[in-house]
Amino acid sequence: MAANMYRVGDYVYFENSSSNPYLIRRIEELNKTANGNVEAKVVCFYRRRDISSSLIALADKHATLSVCYRAGPGADTGEEGEVEEEVENPEMVDLPEKLKHQLRHRELFLSRQLESLPATHIRGKCSVTLLNETESLKSYLEREDFFFYSLVYDPQQKTLLADKGEIRVGNRYQADITDLLKDGEEDGRDQSKLETKVWEAHNPLVDKQIDQFLVVARSVGTFARALDCSSSVRQPSLHMSAAAASRDITLFHAMDTLHKNIYDISKAISALVPQGGPVLCRDEMEEWSASEANLFEEALEKYGKDFTDIQQDFLPWKSLTSIIEYYYMWKTTDRYVQQKRLKAAEAESKLKQVYIPNYNKPNPNQISVNSVKASVVNGTGTPGQSPGAGRACESCYTTQSYQWYSWGPPNMQCRLCASCWTYWKKYGGLKMPTRLDGERPGPNRNNMSPHGIPARSSGSPKFAMKTRQAFYLHTTKLTRIARRLCREILRPWHAARHPYMPINSAAIKAECTARLPEASQSPLVLKQVVRKPLEAVLRYLETHPRPPKPDPVKSSSSVLSSLTPAKSAPVINNGSPTILGKRSYEQHNGVDGLANHGQTRHMGPSRNLLLNGKSYPTKVRLIRGGSLPPVKRRRMNWIDAPDDVFYMATEETRKIRKLLSSSETKRAARRPYKPIALRQSQALPLRPPPPAPVNDEPIVIED
């Protein structure tokens, strides 16, 4: 019952989205609307993930400690050798990376922003406290639902400010304390230079005479306000003018004038009414206009007694001293007393607490086991496992959980276990640091285990945006041994041809462990390599002479710039057309493909430039309807990566491939965006390979 009772001042979780983390808010008011619902007026707290990276770097810089150390000959006296440097918190350095990662999830940023949210969106209580340097950082991790903050975030101005004052430590900021005087020792300092007397207690006047002089000073102040036009506007009645003249600034000025005139009342009265007119003393209550007073009350309602923020956001033309002085005078006015009584009456009529039952509705991100398609991949699990059990949790990498939740973009098909989902909703992050953060070289998104072997995704963030994600297969030593010892059980060729057939990796591992002691005693049988005789090698070299070195190739930009849309020939697509309007490889590179209707095009003699399968003729003009788009003069962007394609080689491409050396073929495969310079030469007709010699006698070559 007490856990579901929420009061003003509680820190609570609010849920605004089923997939996003909870919002952390502090309840300021509980109001009941006209339709009977309860709304909570709350103060916003922001997480590190909610603010920009530049402000995060500024916050991390603020978290460093300034340590002063002394070195050199003046270390004892402190006269020289004092150096100040910024170092990281030593306690933060000793923490492991996992705890550092989780500690960042506990840091919040306070804001002055208020918003109203439905009370039914509350999902639980939490605790938020100001960062205390005397407490251990681990203490924040040991307590559940515990957060801390040290900076104030302004979502409108996008700035960070310190929430408390700082005390600077060091000889430059501390007062010099003199030595303690001994008993009977006199102070040699001149006290007249250290103190200023403003009133003489043993003066010749009695208290009655001083009171009469103060009455005269109030009368002079009232008369001065009657003569001043601006004061007449601000104080329209005689009663208000007399009240303004009776404030402390008039009395202090009268007593100061009496002290300066050596307590001679006649001279003091003459000083209050000089030749130009009576002296007018006004304080901050009279200096401020009505509009400025309204701005101050509005700022005080929003920021409280944070006079620095009041000055910056509402009254930048006023000094901080003037604002503070006006505040303490404003508290003595009748307006403040009336507002205080009105707020107390409103607080009595408002709700003090509200009961919110537990939220038991199912989350839309829950993964239903019955709705998962029952198709598995090699290594996803043994027969009898639930579908999709091979995909591990993105946070803790477990494969067993009573409930799974979808997490991240839908195309990534990532999921979290029940405990990690709760951690994600409360703390706004994963338990383990990700590889994208640069904190560990562990698995990344879409961690799958084909054939029961751990797979590690690529750490580059660009792969996270692709529909099909590349992965790196890291085989262990035991896996490589199992491929040889348990070949009849594993059947690697069959598994490669049927990647959707499940493989019982546990049984293979057990069988490999049983066969391993026997296999270590028998030597490994290596496959014998049959070498060709020397005569066959000589005949092959005679038949296939070394091709001449090609001429230097022009740069890709110059080659592409010389082509015009009318001279650009499309590529014949011999594969099946894409479905659902998917773009082909040629469309990604700015070249449209023609449909192949059973026609065969032959390579012309002037077609001497190939861009990895795309021919660019210089003289042949293709007759077709419409115009071709120009070729893009840039490399293919990784975002525009094509879908999987099927390349069917023709007789023309086979002939062209035979004209290229192996180094040119490999170079073209490594740089598919580079054009291929093909030297036009008549290819020699291929002769059948010579038969192997009958005799095994060596061949002797005489000079």
Curated annotation (Swiss-Prot):
Source taxonomy: Eukaryota, Metazoa, Chordata, Craniata, Vertebrata
Phosphoserine: residues bearing it: 386, 449, 522, 576, 627
Molecular function terms from GO: chromatin binding; enzyme binding; histone deacetylase binding; RNA polymerase II cis-regulatory region sequence-specific DNA binding; RNA polymerase II-specific DNA-binding transcription factor binding; transcription coactivator activity; transcription corepressor activity; zinc ion binding
Record field: compositional bias (Basic and acidic residues): 542-552
Region described as Interaction with RBBP4: 644-674
Residue interval(s) of motif SUMO interaction motif 1 (SIM): 699-703
Modified residues (N6-acetyllysine): 614
SMART domains reported in the protein's UniProt record: BAH, ELM2, SANT, ZnF_GATA
Ranges where the ELM2 domain occurs: 165-276
Cross-link Glycyl lysine isopeptide (Lys-Gly) (interchain with G-Cter in SUMO2 and SUMO3) placement: 509
Organism: Rattus norvegicus (Rat)
Listed GO CC annotations: cytoplasm; endoplasmic reticulum; Golgi apparatus; microtubule; nuclear envelope; nucleoplasm; nucleus; NuRD complex
Ranges of residues in domain SANT: 283-335
Region (Disordered), start-end ranges: 437-460, 542-583, 661-703
Keyword tags: Acetylation, Activator, Biological rhythms, Cytoplasm, Cytoplasmic vesicle, Cytoskeleton, DNA-binding, Endoplasmic reticulum, Golgi apparatus, Isopeptide bond, Metal-binding, Nucleus, Phosphoprotein, Repressor, Transcription, Transcription regulation, Ubl conjugation, Zinc, Zinc-finger
InterPro entries, per database record: BAH_dom, BAH_sf, ELM2_dom, Homeodomain-like_sf, MIER/MTA, MTA1_R1, SANT/Myb, SANT_dom
Post-translational modification: Phosphorylation by CSNK1G2/CK1 triggered by estrogen enhances corepression of estrogen receptor (ER).
Limits of the BAH domain: 1-164
PANTHER family per UniProt: METASTASIS-ASSOCIATED PROTEIN AND MESODERM INDUCTION EARLY RESPONSE PROTEIN (PTHR10865), METASTASIS-ASSOCIATED PROTEIN MTA1 (PTHR10865:SF5)
Protein name stated in the entry: Metastasis-associated protein MTA1
Record text on subunit structure and interactions: Component of the nucleosome remodeling and deacetylase (NuRD) repressor complex, composed of core proteins MTA1, MTA2, MTA3, RBBP4, RBBP7, HDAC1, HDAC2, MBD2, MBD3, and peripherally associated proteins CDK2AP1, CDK2AP2, GATAD2A, GATAD2B, CHD3, CHD4 and CHD5. The exact stoichiometry of the NuRD complex is unknown, and some subunits such as MBD2 and MBD3, GATAD2A and GATAD2B, and CHD3, CHD4 and CHD5 define mutually exclusive NuRD complexes. Interacts with RBBP4; the interaction is direct. Interacts with BMAL1. Interacts with CLOCK. Interacts with COP1. Interacts with CSNK1G2 in the cytoplasm.
Record motif SH3-binding, residues: 545-552, 684-693
Gene Ontology biological process terms from the UniProt entry: chromatin remodeling; circadian regulation of gene expression; double-strand break repair; entrainment of circadian clock by photoperiod; female pregnancy; locomotor rhythm; negative regulation of gene expression, epigenetic; negative regulation of transcription by RNA polymerase II
Extent of Low complexity compositional bias: 553-565
Similarity section: Belongs to the metastasis-associated protein family.
One Pfam family it belongs to: BAH
